[in-house]
């Protein structure tokens, strides 16, 4: 296994953190006394492979997070989170050692969008000593849309066998678009 993980943190505007993360990974294996074969989907012939990818071999992952606020009201923030990565490997069912992890899922990609409004900050106590949230340090109300583009990212397969002993892979997908409303209190 080997990899490289690079992260750059910064602020496009003061007080609003942003970052870019790039990961390059390689996790390969070779089982003793097993001749590994690789075959592309739809191909009739196989080719020999010295090493095959392990189930966690995601070759590349790129994530970006950007945050901003309204210049006239720093209590209102917005953020965008973007992730893209190569697909994870998978193989045929039944712990197949010869054709081990020869295929890959489609690339993973997702965009999240969020808006947040600061309801209270303890530094405001002098201005508003009777505020209902004065017992907290900070209070935020946020609305987030996860998987904004409603992408169907495949997580795994459920294998179904027919009476003629053929196997079919039925995809299992990660969550679709979700809307999240949250109230956060810091004490």
Positions of PLM-derived features:
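Gram-negative outer-membrane beta-barrel transporters
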Residues: 1-92
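Residues that define the transmembrane beta-barrel architecture of outer-membrane proteins
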Residues: 2, 56-62, 107-111, 137, ...
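Outer-membrane beta-barrel architecture
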Residues: 5-8, 19, 65-67, 79, ...
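Short regulatory "switch" loops immediately downstream of catalytic or recognition motifs
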Residues: 27-39, 114-128
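Outer-membrane beta-barrel domain signature
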Residues: 51-55, 100-104, 130, 169-172
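C-terminal beta-signal and adjacent terminal beta-strands/loops
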Residues: 83-93, 117-187
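Outer-membrane beta-barrel transmembrane domain signature
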Residues: 103-112, 187
